[in-house]
């Protein structure tokens, strides 16, 4: 919820310098809650707000970042040199057409569940649970989607359309993990690290959202190519 400082200052007297009344009046801090300490500071009140889920968000975002780096830099598993090898049985995840479809649609389902965060953020009728916990939920499903990505691809980027789909998905997770780390630090309130994170986190979040838009198109053509080519 984007609310200018001028709007908040104009409402201070009306809301009797009460952070809760100011939040109710202007809707500031009612989405993610990370700016609650700033609202209390503006009202001259003692900062009592403890950011919800910040520690969990930081931990899971770091795990997600590590998972993304593994996806990018880890070599794909070697191929089996014998049908009797255990690797040959594992390879069926990436060779068998039916298994590939199962893992692919499972990955898509996990990804879609993770998008529930957008409903919580953008629609007033969807207010179940605190946004901070939804953000942690979103991060956890990002990690699960990377695990599913390995099961589906073996971390092989492929070529042409498959490469760009994989690249976009991995980059989306990379930006999401970075935005999650910055959001967790931002929740610390008014420390220098929090102010630094608050300055750059919106750009990471915006880039994360922009990078999402090509994904449905790439995914659609990927699915069509499986069945028609």
What residues fall within each predicted segment?
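Regular secondary-structure segments
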Residues: 9-13, 151
């Amino acid at each position: 919820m984007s609310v200018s400082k001028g709007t908040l200052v104009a409402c201070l007297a009306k809301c009797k310098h009460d952070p809760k009344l100011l939040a109710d009046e202007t809707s500031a801090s009612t989405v993610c809650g990370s700016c609650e300490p700033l609202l209390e500071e503006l009202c001259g009140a003692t900062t009592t707000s403890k950011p919800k889920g910040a520690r969990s968000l930081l931990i899971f975002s770091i795990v997600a970042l590590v998972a993304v780096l593994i996806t990018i830099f880890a070599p794909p598993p070697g191929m089996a040199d014998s049908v009797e090898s255990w690797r040959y049985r594992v390879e069926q995840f990436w060779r068998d057409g039916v298994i590939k479809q199962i893992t692919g649609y499972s990955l898509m389902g996990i990804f879609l569940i993770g998008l529930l965060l957008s409903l919580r953020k953008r629609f007033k009728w969807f207010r179940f649970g605190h946004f901070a916990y939804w953000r942690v939920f979103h991060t956890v499903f990002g990690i699960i989607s990377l695990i599913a990505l390995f099961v589906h691809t073996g971390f092989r980027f492929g070529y042409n359309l498959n490469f760009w789909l994989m690249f976009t998905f991995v980059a989306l997770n990379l930006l999401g993990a970075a935005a999650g780390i910055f959001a967790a630090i931002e929740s610390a309130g008014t420390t220098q690290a929090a102010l630094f994170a608050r300055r750059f986190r919106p750009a990471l979040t915006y880039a994360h959202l922009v990078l999402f838009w090509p994904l449905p198109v790439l995914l659609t053509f990927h699915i069509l190519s499986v069945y028609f080519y």
